Amino acid sequence: DQAAISYVKSMYEQIGLDTGHMSTVYILKTGAKMLGLAALGMAASILACLMASRVGAKVGRGLRRDTFRKVIGFSNNEFDQFSTASLITRSTNDIQQIQFLTVMILRIVLYAPVMAIGGILKVSKTNVDMFWIIGLAVLLIVMVVAVLFIVVMPKFKIVQNMVDKLNLVSREILTGLPVIRAFHTEKHEEERFDKANKDLTKLNLFVNRAMTFMMPTMMLVMNGITVLIVWVGGHSINDGAMQVGDMMAFIQYAMQIIMSFLMICMISVMLPRAAVSAERVDEVLKSETKIHDPKEPKTLPKNGKGEVAFEHVSFHYPGAEEDVLHDITFTAKPGETTAFIGSTGCGKSTLVNLIPRFYDVTEGKITIDGQDVRDLTQHALRDKLGYVPQKGVLFSGNIASNIMFGNPAGSEQEMTEAAQIAQAVEFIDTKPERYKSPISQGGANVSGGQKQRLSIARAIAKHPDVYIFDDSFSALDYKTDTVLRSALKEKTTDSVVLIVAQRISTILHAEQIIVLDDGKIVGKGTHEELLKTCDTYYQIAASQLSESELKEAMKEED
């Protein structure tokens, strides 16, 4: 061969051809083509990465948006099913896993088959006899991945559940830190957090060790296959059946094929964790919302004043066998205050939570201005309500944004009027920025009483037809409570006012007091009437009022 090459070269030189120059030109042209293809491949790779990242980000954004919209529409039934910590994990960590897998699929799953097919086509032109070596390599890789699947797959769901648990423990500790310090139980809470943290760390270490085992095993397979190709190829070269260049090309193409399968297998290993995350997100998205708008909603009368009526209402929580409320019937009229009182756990808060449809009644119906609340859209219903929960809830922003939360288009005069009625002006005026004073997350920089007054002001600024105060005056002192209710009475002359209370003093002057005991109405009337007709109410009053106050009230009735 070498002699033939030398002879041909000498013949070219004899006829005047410069073989050296020709070789140089050929090398330069081929090198330029190779550089061009490499640059094109680099540009295509960068473009593919950018497009994959863009698509992945959009997938993540869409899932977060859909999950958030779904959660916003949850009733209390769904919130009882999914813990807050779990919903946060599903909306962040789980969606991030899905987003990461989406990017990897677009970058690798489309690229790897093309690379594998190209490698197979090239190998078929070099030496088909050693193709069984590539098949052996692929088989070994699949076996390694299958073992990892069997070992690791069941652990991924446990990992996500443990993340939920750790988030729950962290949230409980952070929100309850003042109580923890007051009872000096920091050590116990540290141990509780450490246990959740160690359990998660231990399982993560197991999963990561199993995953770490994969790459060295894959490299061992690749190096072993290279040695096998050299060994088999060496014998073929020795027998004259193969050239050294063909063997080197076969090694390169074989590595290309094996790498493509390796990349697909790596995606396959990521798939179980993302599949668990996708399943958890899907649980939220596909959860059936118990409270939904009717297909053909009705509208409230334009001249309605918000009269609320309960007609033989009974209710039990999902999964519970016994009713929490039994055959509740009453009417709350505009311009009047209807109060609910009773022992702890008698169903007062549950009753008022049925009006905005946080839950739906089990039996009977609730009407506003004669329309069943289930026949209205949730927006139309809640637009008529001003709700103040037991625990004051504030949002990050400032005092003004919190007061005008339900009426963002309201005027400054409406805001100051609401603050004055809620007795919030006295502490707002002490702040340098007054209504622009910042409110930290959850209202952590204001006291419980201030938080409650701002929550009341928020409801007043909305100008609703129906006010619902769910034990909202409990954080106020007696003086503030009295002045606030007096100012509120003047403001709500045309509105329905529903008050859940523990203190008799809060509801003394209510036009209608409903006494609940074990979910049933055991008394209905004014303060003076109930002292004579309802033993349960009398016992509550006797525990809070002096004997002279009781006698005076009973004389007024006489």
Predicted regions and their residues:
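Transmembrane-helix motif of ABC transporter permease domains
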Residues: 1-60, 80, 133, 144-147, ...
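Juxtamembrane helix-loop junctions of ABC transporter transmembrane domains
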Residues: 28, 37-84, 88, 92, ...
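Residue-level recognition of pore/gate-forming positions within transmembrane alpha-helices
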Residues: 38, 108, 112, 138-142
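Helix-loop junctions and hydrophobic alpha-helical segments within the transmembrane domains
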Residues: 67, 71, 180, 193, ...
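An intracellular "coupling" helix at the cytosolic face of ABC transporter transmembrane type-1 domains
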Residues: 76-77, 93-102, 106, 110, ...
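Helix-loop-helix
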Residues: 118, 122-139, 143, 206-280, ...
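Pre-NBD coupling/linker segments of ABC/ABC-like ATPases
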Residues: 289-303
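ABC-type nucleotide-binding domain
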Residues: 301-558
